[in-house]
Amino acid sequence: MTEENRTYITHLKVADVPWHRLTTAYGRGTDFPAHLAVLEQMKNPKAVKKALYKLTANMEHQSTLWHATPFGMVFLSRILEKALTESGQNPVAHFLAGELLDFFACILPVSYTHLTLPTN
């Protein structure tokens, strides 16, 4: 990863992403900011489960990744870091950390499936 890419990812804000233009499994990423905000708060277990389902179902479907997926992963990575930090004192954060780790484990093999490896 280049330093330029790392800087972009580090400073990217949810509002900077043109979610309405990014395709997902079921449409566009227009609702991603609201779902990410619910996850970031880690307060209401029912709302967190619903938001997480909406995001993950739209980011990966039948081993297909969508245009919104890389941007969603940036923010889910940040949320995972926060959830891991708070998981000892917040049961919602503990639940969310486990679910995000499972989702990341699901995404990793899919992302490698779509790589084109150089041939000699």
List the model feature ranges, each with a label.
Residues 67-74:
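Short sequence/structural elements of tandem HEAT/ARM alpha-solenoid repeats
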Residues 113-119:
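Conserved small/polar residues in nucleotide/adenosyl-binding loops
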Residues 57-61, 78, 82, 102-110:
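Positions within ordered alpha-helical repeat solenoids
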Residues 48-56:
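HEAT-repeat alpha-solenoid elements in large eukaryotic scaffold proteins
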Residues 86-108:
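Short secondary-structure subsegments characteristic of cysteine-rich extracellular domains
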Residues 36-41, 74-81, 85:
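HEAT/HEAT-like alpha-solenoid repeats
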Residues 1-46:
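N-terminal "cap/leader" segments of large eukaryotic alpha-helical scaffolds
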